[in-house]
């Protein structure tokens, strides 16, 4: 039996529909500073995030048609940067938003693990790292809403 998603989590108390005009992407650091990551919601924010890397890169927002995606960049063979791109979610139910953020968080964690050159991190380290990344992305998603 499938439980109606809205019965699990009523996000209407937390998020309104629409994007905030004031939101600016904020670079976050992974544990031990291997990867920096941020969340963007539109092309303007994508441009600002890429511009802040000083690389001259230009890339369309959500170049691949999907709900959300993480793109990765390496600057001067030093640090990896990940940009989580998620567009308008005004017609999504709150569970779909949470599921998407968790899914994309896993991709950021995969980049972190790769940058650390860690094949088998401890279960607890992995769980705590993913929790940290997810909480940052959830906070940024919340800030990006009106």
Residue locations for each model-derived region?
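N-terminal low-structure segments adjacent to metalloprotease catalytic domains
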Residues: 1-45, 89
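Structural signature of transmembrane alpha-helix termini at the membrane-water interface
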Residues: 7, 109-112, 141
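A conserved mid-domain beta-alpha-beta active-site/ligand-binding segment of alpha/beta enzyme cores
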Residues: 41, 49-52
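Active-site scaffold of zinc-dependent metalloenzymes
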Residues: 53-95, 108
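Short, conserved micro-motifs enriched in small and acidic residues
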Residues: 95-96, 100, 121-125
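Active-site recognition of the HExxH zinc-binding catalytic motif
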Residues: 99-111
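Short helix/strand-bridging catalytic loops that position acidic/His residues to coordinate divalent metals
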Residues: 113-120
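Post-HExxH zinc-binding segment in Zn-dependent metallohydrolases
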Residues: 120-146
